[in-house]
C-alpha cells in the first residue's frame, strides 16, 4: 500500500470526521435502544428491559474506560449518559417494587444499592430531576444516613430552577413536593445539631418564614424502604452489642488461661517481639471486645495423670522443635538434637528393608550367625594382636588381648561385675540405649571451650561463678506447691462478670501473676509457687508485646505497681541468661549467632531502663523489695561486667549487710527462674568467697598492671598447685591456700573439670607445649580417678551415665586441643619427657573409647543392639573425632619412643602402627574424622621414611586425604569413604620431596625413567606452591633480574670462551626461605622434567602446542633463581626454547619470510643458546664430575652445536648472532668529533670464524666425551649424531682439504648409527652423507673413483653389495669411469630409499635426479624422479610432497622445497613442457607458506613458461598486439570469430593446443600483468583463427584483387590499402585485445 500523502489532503481531519460520524450513529442507536428499554420497562417486562440496558451499556459512547473516564464529551452525550444511568436506576427501583416479596434480605439490599449507584452516577452527567433526588432522599432516610440525606436535599435546593423559585419571583408556584422536602430538611438540621442553620440561615436565605411554624411531614416510605429501614435498625441494635469471645479452658489453671489468651492472637516469635517492639493484638483482623471463659466439663473430669502425660508429651515436642538451633549442654530440658530426639520412632521398614522374605531353619540360622560374628570380630582380633606386638617393640607392656577386653561386656548383671569394669559396661549401656538426653550431655563442652576474645573468656569465668549457685539451687527441697486454684477461680469470675476487653484481661492477668496477691507481705505468685515452663514463656511473650505500655503505666503509678516492675525486671534478666547461654552453645558448635547477639543488646537496653525505674522505687526502707532488686541486679551484672568488676563484690556486700540487719533466715528459691539462683545468706556469702577465689585463679589480669605477665604466671601456678594437691594429696606442696583447696575439693565434679579446663586452656593460649602435655596427662589421671571413685560406683545408673558422658566430653575436648597445638608446631618433638605410665594412661583412655567400636561390631549380629553410628550421627561423629584424636596422640608418642629406643627400626615400627590404625578406622569408615588429623600426622611421618613399605601406606593416605589414586602392579589402595580436601602448601613441600627421593632413589632424574603415575600429584604440589617469583622477597627479585638480564645478552666470543672454561656465572644468592629445601630437592626441576617428557610424547603424535611450554619454562626459571646450581635445569630450559624455535620453523614459512616474526624466532634461538652455554659452564666449573653428569652434558653439547648450526645457516642466516640494544636511539662521536644521535642498529656480536670454531668445539668435545664415557661404561651407546654433525659441518666448511678426517668421522657415525638403530627402521642420515660426500669429492676432483669406492665399501654392512660392486674398471676412460661411478651412486641412493620405511627421506631422490640431469643428461629420468616429489598435475593442493625427517634441521625443509622447484623448472624447460610449467605456476601462487623466495620462484616459472611456449609453438613475441591486431578488419574478425565459435571442436585439435589455450587464458585471468598475453593470443591466432580465415578466403572470389591478402602464419604483412574507386564509408573500428580475449573465453568454456 502506498504511503504517499498529497499536500492538500488532511488525514487527521478525515479521521476525525469518520469518528464523528460513527459517534453520531452510536448516539442515535443508543437513544433507540433506550426507548425500547423504557417501553419494556413500562410494560414491566423486566427481562427484556434488562437485556436492553446491558446492550446499551456495551456501546462505546455510553461505556466508560477502565478508569471510569469518557473519551468524548458533549451536551448530547452528557444527556444520553444521564438518561441511561437515571433510567437504569429507576429500573432497579421499579423491579424491587414488583418483586420485593420474593427477594431475601441480601438480594433486596444488593438491588437497592445498584439503584443508588446508577442514580448517583447519573447526577455526574447532568442535573437530576426531582424524581431522582426525591428517591435518593427516601433511600438515604431508610438507611438512616442523615448526612447523605442532607447532602441530596441541599443538592435539590441549589439547582438553578429551584433557586429562581426560592428567590421570591415565583414563590407562589412552589410545589408541595419541594415544600415537603424543605420541611424534612429542617428536621435534619435539628438532628445534626446545627441550630444556626435550622433557625436562621436557611429561612433568611430562602425567605421561608411562613413555613417556619409548619410541622414538618415525614417522607413517606414505600414497602421496600420500610423494610430496609427496619433492617437497618436491627443492624444498629446488633452493632451495639459487644462481640464476646468465649474461650474454652481444659482445666482451671493459669497456664491454660494464658495459653487460651495467647491463642486468640496471631503467632509471633519472641525474638520478633524483642526486635520490633510490637503488640501482636495489632495484627488481628477483628477486635476482641470482650472475653468470657468457659470450663470444658469433659476434659475437666480427666484424671490428672493423663494431663501430666500430655504435658510431658508437649514438652518433648517443644524440645524437638528446639533441636535445630541449640547444642548440647549439661543443663537438662533446654537443648535437644535433631538426630536423637525421637529414639523410639524408628520404623520397622527401615530395619527390615534389607532382610530377604524367606524362611530358613533355625539351626542353619544360628550357625550362620556364629560364623558371621566371628568374621565381624576378626578385625578386632587382628588389631589387638598387631597393636600389642608393636608395643613390645618399644618395650611397653601389652594392654590386653581381645578376649580379655571382650569379657568386660559379657559378664552377668552389673552387681556381679568387678568394679574396674563398671565404666566399660556403663558406656556400653549408654550406646545401647542412646537417647536425646545422652546427646545433650555428651555434646556440651561450654565449660571447657575458651573464647575467641577476652569477653568470651570472662564469660567462661562467670559460668564458673554461677556453677555452684545453680547446684545449690537444685539441692533445694521441692517444698513448693503448684499454683493453687483459689486465685485462678477468682480471676475467671472477675473476667466473666465484667465483660472486659482483651487488653483489660491481659493486663489483669499480668497483674495477678507478676504483681502481689498479699499486699501486706509483698508476696508474689511467681516467687511462691512453681509454674509450668510454658506459662512462664507465655507471660514473657505478653510482657514483650506490651512492655512500653506497661512501663508507662508503672511510671505513673510507681508505688502501686512496684512489685509488678520487679517481676518484669526479673523476667528480663532471666531471659537475658537464656540468650547468653544459647549464644555460647552456638559458638561452641561454630554456628553464627549474630541474631542472638542483637537480641542480647536489645534486652540489655530494656533491662537498663527498668533498672533505672526500679532505682527510683526501691529503697532500703522496703527491705524485701530492695533485697530482691539487688539480687536480680547482681545476676544481671554477671552477664555484663568482668569477673574483677568491683560492682559484683559491692552488690554482694550490700546484700549481706541488709539480710543480716533484717532477717537472716531469708530463703527465696526463685523456682521459675533458671538464671536467678536461690537467695539466702549462705548463697550470698558463698558467692563472695567464689569471687575472691576465682579472682585469685583468674588467668588473665584485666587491670592495667605492668606486671600482668607475672601475675598471670602466679595465678597459673596457684591453680595448678591446688589442683595437683587435690589429685595427689600425698604430695607435699608449699604455700597452699587451704581455703581454696577446701573450696575446690568440696566443689561439684563439673566445677573441677572446668578448673582443669581453665588451666589447660591458659597454657594452650600461651603456646606452652610442654605444660599443655603435662596438664593433659594429669587430666587423664583425674578422669580415671573420677570413674573409679566410690562416688561413681555408689551412684545410680542415671548419675553414672551422666558423669561418664561428661568425662568423655572433657577428654575429647582436651585431646582435640592438644592435637591442635602439636599440629600447629608441625608435630616436632619438644623437651617434654614422656614417662611409660603416661603412655599407658593414654592407651587406657583409647581402649576405653574402643568400646564404641566393639559395640558397633556387636550390633551387626545382635538384633537388640542398634548401630550407634547410624542412629546418632551427630554424637557418633563427635565420638569418632575423639578416637581419631587419641589415636593421633598414640601415633605421635609412639614414634618418639621408637626414635629413642629403637632408632634403627623407627621407620618400620611407625609404618606398621599407621597400617594397623588406618586399617581399623578405615573398616569403620572414619579415618578422616577430626578434620583429618590422623591422616595429616601419618603423612608427615611416612614422608620421613624412604622405603616401599611407607610408600604403600602413603598411597592409602593420599587417597583418603586428597583422593589421589596412584596405581601400581602390586598394590591398590582401599577406597575408604572419605571427603577429599585441598592440599595445603605446608603439606605439599615434604610430600613432593619424599616422592622425588622415593622415585629416583639417589639416581639422577634426568637419566631415569619418569613415572607418569606421580605426575598428577606433582602437578598439584606445584600448583599449591604457586609461582615463587611473585613472592615479596628481595633475593628472589634480584635473582630473577639477573636471570632475565643474562637471557637478553648477546652472544660473543668471550662468552663462548668463558663457557668452555667454566667461568660463566650469574652469581645468584640462595633465598633460604620455606621453599629452599624443596627447591634443592628438585620439586620444580622434576616436575618440569616430567612435563617436558609428556610434551615430547605429545609432540611425536603432533598433539603438542608450544603454549604448553610456558608453564615448564616458568618452573625451570623458579628452580634456577633459587640457586640450585643444577645444570640440568639450564639444559631443560634450553630445550624448551629450542622446541619453540622448532615449532616456529617447521610448520609454515610465514615466520621466516616476515622480518618481524623472524626477529622473534632469533630472540628465542639466542635464549636457547645462552641456556646451553650456562649449562656447559656450570658443568665445567664442577670439580667432581660423575659419569651421569658426562652423559647429560654430552646431550647439551650436541643440542648447542645443532642450535648454533641452525642459527648460522639458512633460513635464520646468523640472525641470532646479531644484537640490538633496547634503546631506540644511541649517541656516538662523528668523524668531526661531535656527539650525534642515530637510530639503534643491529650489530653482529661474533664473527663467522668464531661461530664455526664454536660449532667444531661442541661436536669435537661431544665425540671425545663419548669415548670417555664408553671407557667407563661398557653398556653406554655412543651418540652417532655427534660424529655425524661434526663430519657434516666439516664437510661443508672444509672444501675437501681434510677429506680423510671428514671421512673418518662419517664412517664412525655410520658404524654407530648402524649398530644403535633397529634393522627395520635404520638411521639414514650418516649413510646418505657418506654417499653424497664421495659423489661431490669425485666430481670436484678431490679424490678418485677408487678412493671413493673404498670409502663407500667401509659401510657395506649397511649397503649389502657384492665385492665386485666396489671394484672400478680402470681400463675405461676417465669419463666412462665417472659415468659408471655415478650409476653406482644412484644405486646406493636407491638403496637408501628402499630401507626408508616411513618414506620421509627425500634428499636421496633429489640427488638421483640431480645426477641424472647434470651428469648423465637423462632429463626424462630426472623428471620422473622429481615427479614423485612434486605433484604439479594432481588435484592435491600441495605442490611439493615431502615430510621433514626426524633429524633434519628445522627450517631447512623450506630451503629444500625451493631447491626442488628450481630443479623441476629447469627440467621442464629442458623439454619445453609449458603446460606443466603453467600448472606449477597455478599451484605456486597458493603455495606461498610452503617455501621461501616464492616471488623469485614465480618469476622464474613465468619466464620458463613463456619461453617454452614460444619455442615449442613457434610464437612471435609481442607481434600479435602491436602488428596483427591493427591489420584485422573488424567485420571480418567478428564473422570469423563467430564462425570459429560455432564450428570449434576440441577433438579436432591436439591436446597440447586446447589445454594450452585454456591454461594460458586461466593464467592471464589470474595475473595482473601481460606476461601471458602473447602465449594466449599466439595460440588463438596461429592455431585457431588464421587456419579458419584462410579456409574461408579460398571460397571467395580469387579474382577480387581489392581484397587484402591475409597474413600467413608466422609472417607480418603490410597494411592493405583500400580501393580508391570505392565509396566513402564509416570510420573503420579497430579490433581490441579485450575483444579477442572475450572470443577466447567463449572457446575456453567449451574445453573440458
Curated annotation (Swiss-Prot):
GO terms for molecular function: transcription corepressor activity. GO terms for cellular component: chromosome; HIR complex; nucleus. Transmembrane segments: none annotated. It is found in: Nucleus; Chromosome. Residues 1597-1610 have a biased composition (Polar residues). Residues 339-353 have a biased composition (Basic and acidic residues). It comes from the Eukaryota. Present with 922 molecules/cell in log phase SD medium. Component of the HIR complex, composed of HIR1, HIR2, HIR3 and HPC2. This complex may consist of one copy of HIR1 and HIR3 and two copies of HIR2 and HPC2. The HIR complex interacts with ASF1. Interacts with RTT106. Belongs to the HIR3 family. HIR1, HIR2 and HIR3 are repressors of histone gene transcription. They are required for the periodic repression of three of the four histone gene loci during cell cycle as well as for autogenous regulation of the HTA1-HTB1 locus by H2A and H2B. Also has a role in nucleosome assembly. This is Histone transcription regulator 3.
Amino acid at each position: 500500500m502506498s504511503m504517499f500523502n498529497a499536500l492538500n489532503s488532511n488525514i487527521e481531519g478525515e479521521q476525525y470526521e469518520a469518528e464523528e460520524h460513527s459517534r453520531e450513529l452510536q448516539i442515535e442507536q443508543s437513544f433507540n435502544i433506550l426507548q425500547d428499554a423504557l417501553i419494556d420497562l413500562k410494560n414491566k417486562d423486566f427481562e427484556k428491559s434488562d437485556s436492553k440496558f446491558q446492550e446499551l451499556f456495551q456501546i462505546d459512547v455510553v461505556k466508560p474506560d477502565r478508569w471510569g473516564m469518557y473519551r468524548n464529551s458533549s451536551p448530547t452525550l452528557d444527556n444520553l449518559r444521564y438518561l441511561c444511568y437515571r433510567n437504569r436506576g429507576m429500573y432497579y427501583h421499579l423491579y424491587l417494587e414488583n418483586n420485593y416479596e420474593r427477594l431475601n434480605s441480601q438480594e433486596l439490599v444488593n438491588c437497592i444499592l445498584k439503584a443508588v449507584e446508577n442514580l448517583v452516577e447519573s447526577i455526574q452527567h447532568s442535573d437530576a430531576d426531582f424524581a431522582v433526588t426525591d428517591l435518593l432522599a427516601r433511600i438515604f432516610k431508610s438507611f438512616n444516613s442523615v448526612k447523605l440525606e442532607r447532602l441530596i436535599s441541599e443538592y435539590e435546593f441549589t439547582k438553578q430552577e429551584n433557586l429562581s423559585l426560592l428567590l421570591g419571583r415565583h414563590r407562589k408556584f412552589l410545589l408541595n413536593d419541594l415544600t415537603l422536602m424543605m420541611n424534612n430538611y429542617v428536621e435534619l438540621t435539628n438532628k445534626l445539631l446545627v441550630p444556626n442553620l435550622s433557625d436562621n440561615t436557611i429561612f433568611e436565605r430562602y425567605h421561608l418564614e411562613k413555613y417556619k411554624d409548619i410541622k414538618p411531614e415525614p417522607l413517606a416510605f414505600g414497602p421496600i424502604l420500610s423494610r430496609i429501614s427496619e433492617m437497618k435498625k436491627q443492624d444498629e441494635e446488633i452493632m451495639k452489642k459487644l462481640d464476646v469471645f468465649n474461650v474454652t479452658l481444659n482445666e482451671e489453671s493459669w497456664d491454660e488461661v494464658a495459653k487460651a489468651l495467647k491463642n486468640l492472637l496471631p503467632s509471633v516469635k519472641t525474638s520478633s517481639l524483642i526486635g520490633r517492639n510490637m503488640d501482636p493484638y495489632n495484627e488481628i483482623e477483628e477486635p476482641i471486645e470482650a472475653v468470657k471463659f468457659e470450663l470444658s466439663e469433659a476434659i475437666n473430669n480427666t484424671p490428672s495423670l493423663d494431663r501430666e502425660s500430655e504435658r510431658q508429651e508437649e514438652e518433648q515436642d517443644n524440645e524437638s522443635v528446639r533441636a535445630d538451633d541449640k547444642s548440647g549442654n549439661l543443663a537438662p530440658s533446654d537443648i535437644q538434637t535433631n538426630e536423637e530426639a525421637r529414639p523410639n520412632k524408628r520404623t520397622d521398614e527401615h530395619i527390615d528393608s534389607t532382610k530377604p522374605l524367606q524362611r530358613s531353619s533355625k539351626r542353619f540360622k544360628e550357625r550362620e550367625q556364629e560364623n558371621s560374628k566371628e568374621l565381624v570380630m576378626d578385625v578386632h582380633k587382628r588389631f589387638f594382636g598387631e597393636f600389642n606386638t608393636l608395643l613390645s617393640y618399644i618395650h611397653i607392656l601389652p594392654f590386653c588381648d581381645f578376649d580379655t577386653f571382650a569379657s568386660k561386656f559379657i559378664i552377668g548383671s552389673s552387681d556381679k561385675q568387678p568394679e574396674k569394669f563398671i565404666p566399660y559396661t556403663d558406656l556400653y549401656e549408654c550406646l545401647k540405649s542412646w537417647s536425646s538426653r545422652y546427646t545433650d550431655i555428651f555434646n556440651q563442652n561450654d565449660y571447657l571451650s575458651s573464647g575467641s576474645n577476652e569477653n568470651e573468656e570472662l564469660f567462661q569465668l562467670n559460668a564458673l561463678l554461677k556453677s555452684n549457685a545453680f547446684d545449690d539451687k537444685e539441692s533445694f527441697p521441692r517444698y513448693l506447691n503448684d499454683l493453687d486454684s483459689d486465685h485462678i477461680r477468682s480471676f475467671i469470675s472477675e473476667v466473666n462478670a465484667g465483660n472486659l476487653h482483651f487488653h483489660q484481661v491481659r493486663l489483669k492477668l499480668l497483674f495477678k501473676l507478676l504483681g502481689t496477691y498479699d499486699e501486706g507481705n509483698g508476696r508474689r505468685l511467681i516467687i511462691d509457687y512453681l509454674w509450668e515452663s510454658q506459662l512462664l514463656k507465655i507471660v514473657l511473650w505478653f510482657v514483650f508485646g506490651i512492655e512500653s505500655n506497661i512501663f508507662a503505666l508503672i511510671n505513673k503509678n510507681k508505688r502501686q505497681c512496684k512489685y509488678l516492675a520487679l517481676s518484669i525486671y526479673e523476667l528480663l534478666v532471666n531471659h537475658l541468661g537464656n540468650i547468653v547461654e544459647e549464644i555460647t552453645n552456638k559458638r561452641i558448635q561454630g554456628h553464627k549467632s549474630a541474631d542472638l547477639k542483637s537480641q542480647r543488646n536489645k534486652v540489655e537496653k530494656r533491662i537498663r531502663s527498668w533498672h533505672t525505674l526500679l532505682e527510683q522505687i526501691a529503697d532500703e526502707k522496703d527491705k524485701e523489695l530492695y533485697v530482691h532488686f539487688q539480687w536480680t541486679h547482681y545476676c544481671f551484672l554477671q552477664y555484663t561486667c568482668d569477673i574483677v568488676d568491683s560492682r559484683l563484690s559491692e552488690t554482694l556486700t550490700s546484700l549481706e549487710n541488709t539480710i543480716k540487719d533484717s532477717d537472716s533466715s531469708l530463703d527465696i528459691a526463685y523456682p521459675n527462674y533458671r538464671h536467678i539462683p536461690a537467695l539466702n545468706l549462705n548463697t550470698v556469702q558463698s558467692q563472695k568467697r567464689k569471687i575472691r577465689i576465682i579472682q585469685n585463679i583468674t588467668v588473665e589480669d584485666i587491670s592495667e598492671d605492668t606486671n600482668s605477665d607475672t601475675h598471670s604466671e602466679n595465678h597459673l601456678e596457684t591453680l595448678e598447685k591446688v589442683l595437683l594437691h587435690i589429685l595427689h594429696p600425698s604430695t607435699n606442696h608449699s604455700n597452699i591456700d587451704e581455703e581454696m583447696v577446701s573450696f575446690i575439693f568440696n566443689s561439684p565434679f563439673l566445677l573441677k573439670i572446668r578448673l582443669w579446663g581453665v588451666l589447660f586452656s591458659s597454657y594452650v593460649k600461651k603456646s606452652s607445649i610442654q605444660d599443655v602435655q603435662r596438664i593433659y596427662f594429669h587430666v587423664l589421671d583425674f578422669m580415671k580417678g573420677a570413674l573409679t571413685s566410690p562416688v561413681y560406683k555408689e551412684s545410680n545408673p542415671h548419675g553414672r551415665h551422666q558423669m561418664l558422658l561428661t568425662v568423655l566430653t572433657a577428654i575429647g575436648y582436651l585431646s582435640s586441643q592438644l592435637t591442635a597445638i602439636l599440629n600447629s608446631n608441625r608435630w616436632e618433638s619438644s623437651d617434654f619427657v614422656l614417662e611409660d605410665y603416661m603412655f599407658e594412661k593414654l592407651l587406657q583412655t583409647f581402649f576405653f573409647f574402643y568400646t564404641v567400636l566393639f559395640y558397633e561390631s556387636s550390633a551387626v549380629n545382635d538384633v537388640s543392639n542398634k548401630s550407634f553410628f547410624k542412629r546418632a550421627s551427630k554424637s557418633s561423629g563427635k565420638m569418632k573425632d575423639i578416637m581419631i584424636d587419641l589415636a593421633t596422640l598414640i601415633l605421635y608418642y609412639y614414634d618418639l619412643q621408637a626414635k629413642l629406643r629403637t632408632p634403627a627400626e623407627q621407620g618400620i615400627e611407625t609404618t606398621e602402627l599407621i597400617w594397623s590404625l588406618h586399617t581399623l578406622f578405615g573398616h569403620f569408615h572414619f579415618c578422616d574424622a577430626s578434620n583429618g588429623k590422623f591422616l595429616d600426622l601419618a603423612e608427615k611421618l611416612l614422608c620421613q621414611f624412604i622405603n616401599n613399605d611407607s610408600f604403600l601406606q602413603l598411597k592409602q593416605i593420599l587417597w583418603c586425604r586428597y583422593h589421589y589414586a596412584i596405581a601400581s602392579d602390586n598394590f591398590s589402595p582401599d577406597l575408604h569413604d572419605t571427603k577429599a580436601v585441598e592440599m595445603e602448601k605446608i603439606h605439599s613441600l615434604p610430600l613432593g620431596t619424599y616422592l622425588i627421593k622415593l622415585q629416583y632413589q639417589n639416581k639422577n632424574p634426568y637419566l631415569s625413567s619418569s613415572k607418569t603415575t606421580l605426575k598428577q600429584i606433582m602437578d598439584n604440589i606445584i600448583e599449591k606452591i604457586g609461582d615463587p617469583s611473585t613472592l615479596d622477597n628481595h633475593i628472589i627479585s634480584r635473582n630473577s633480574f639477573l636471570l632475565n638480564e643474562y637471557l637478553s645478552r648477546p652472544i660473543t666470543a668471550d662468552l663462548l670462551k668463558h663457557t668452555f672454561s667454566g667461568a660463566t656465572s650469574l652469581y645468584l644468592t640462595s633465598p633460604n626461605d620455606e621453599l629452599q629445601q624443596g627447591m634443592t630437592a628438585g620439586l620444580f626441576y622434576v616436575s618440569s622434567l616430567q612435563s617436558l617428557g609428556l610434551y615430547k610424547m605429545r609432540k611425536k603424535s603432533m598433539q603438542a602446542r608450544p603454549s604448553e611450554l610456558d608453564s615448564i619454562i616458568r618452573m625451570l626459571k623458579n628452580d634456577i633463581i633459587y640457586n640450585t646450581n643444577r645444570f640440568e635445569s639450564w639444559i631443560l630450559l634450553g630445550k624448551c626454547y629450542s622446541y619453540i624455535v622448532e615449532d616456529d620453523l617447521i610448520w609454515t614459512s610465514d615466520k621466516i619470510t616476515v622480518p618481524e616474526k623472524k626477529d622473534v624466532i632469533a630472540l628465542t634461538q639466542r635464549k636457547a643458546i645462552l641456556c646451553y652455554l650456562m649449562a656447559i659452564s656450570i658443568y665445567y666449573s664442577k670439580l667432581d664430575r660423575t659419569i651421569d653428569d658426562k652423559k647429560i652434558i654430552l646431550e647439551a653439547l650436541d643440542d648447542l652445536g645443532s642450535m648454533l648450526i641452525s642459527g648460522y645457516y639458512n633460513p635464520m642466516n646468523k640472525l641470532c648472532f646479531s644484537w640490538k640494544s633496547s634503546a631506540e636511539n644511541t649517541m656516538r662521536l662523528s668523524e668531526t668529533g661531535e656527539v650525534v644521535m642515530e637510530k639503534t642498529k643491529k650489530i653482529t656480536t661474533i664473527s663467522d670464524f668464531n661461530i664455526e670454531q664454536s660449532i667444531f668445539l661442541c661436536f669435537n668435545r661431544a665425540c671425545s666425551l663419548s669415548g670417555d664415557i664408553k671407557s667407563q661404561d661398557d653398556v653406554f651407546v655412543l651418540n652417532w649424531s655427534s660424529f655425524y654433525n661434526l663430519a657434516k659441518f666439516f664437510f661443508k666448511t672444509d672444501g675437501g682439504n681434510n677429506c680423510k678426517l671428514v671421512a673418518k668421522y662419517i664412517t664412525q657415525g655410520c658404524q654407530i648409527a648402524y649398530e644403535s638403530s633397529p634393522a627395520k627402521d635404520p638411521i639414514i642420515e650418516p649413510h646418505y652423507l657418506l654417499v653424497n660426500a664421495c659423489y661431490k669429492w669425485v666430481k670436484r676432483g678431490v679424490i678418485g673413483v677408487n678412493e671413493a669406492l673404498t670409502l663407500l665399501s667401509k659401510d657395506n654392512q649397511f649397503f649389502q653389495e657384492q665385492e665386485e660392486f666396489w671394484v672400478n674398471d680402470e681400463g675405461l676412460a676417465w669419463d666412462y669411469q665417472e659415468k659408471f661411478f655415478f650409476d653406482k651412486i644412484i644405486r646406493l641412493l636407491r638403496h637408501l630409499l628402499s630401507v626408508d620405511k616411513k618414506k620421509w627421506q627425500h634428499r636421496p631422490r633429489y640427488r638421483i635426479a640431480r645426477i641424472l640431469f647434470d651428469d648423465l643428461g637423462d632429463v626424462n629420468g630426472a623428471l620422473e624422479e622429481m615427479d614423485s616429489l612434486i605433484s604439479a598435475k594432481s588435484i592435491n593442493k600441495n605442490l611439493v610432497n615431502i615430510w621433514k625427517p626426524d633429524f633434519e634441521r628445522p627450517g631447512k625443509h623450506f630451503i629444500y622445497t625451493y631447491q626442488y622447484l628450481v630443479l623441476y623448472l629447469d627440467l621442464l624447460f629442458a623439454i619445453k613442457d609449458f603446460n606443466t610449467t603453467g600448472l606449477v605456476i597455478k599451484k605456486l601462487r597458493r603455495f606461498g607458506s610452503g617455501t621461501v623466495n616464492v616471488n623469485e620462484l614465480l618469476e622464474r616459472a613465468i619466464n620458463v613458461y613463456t619461453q617454452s611456449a614460444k619455442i615449442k609453438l613457434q610464437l612471435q613475441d609481442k607481434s600479435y598486439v602491436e602488428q596483427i591486431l591493427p591489420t584485422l578488419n573488424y567485420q571480418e574478425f567478428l564473422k570469423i570469430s563467430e564462425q570459429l565459435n560455432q564450428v570449434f571442436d576440441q577433438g579436432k585439435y591436439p591436446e597440447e593446443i586446447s589445454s594450452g589455450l585454456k591454461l594460458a587464458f586461466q593464467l592471464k585471468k589470474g595475473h595482473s600483468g601481460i606476461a601471458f598475453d602473447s602465449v594466449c593470443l599466439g595460440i588463438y591466432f596461429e592455431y585457431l583463427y588464421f587456419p579458419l580465415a584462410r579456409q574461408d578466403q579460398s571460397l571467395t572470389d580469387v579474382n577480387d584483387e581489392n581484397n587484402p591478402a591475409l597474413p600467413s602464419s608466422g609472417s607480418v604483412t603490410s597494411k592493405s590499402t583500400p580501393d580508391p574507386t570505392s565509396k566513402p564509408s564509416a570510420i573503420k573500428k579497430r579490433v581490441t585485445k579485450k575483444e579477442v580475449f572475450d572470443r577466447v573465453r567463449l572457446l575456453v568454456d567449451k574445453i573440458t
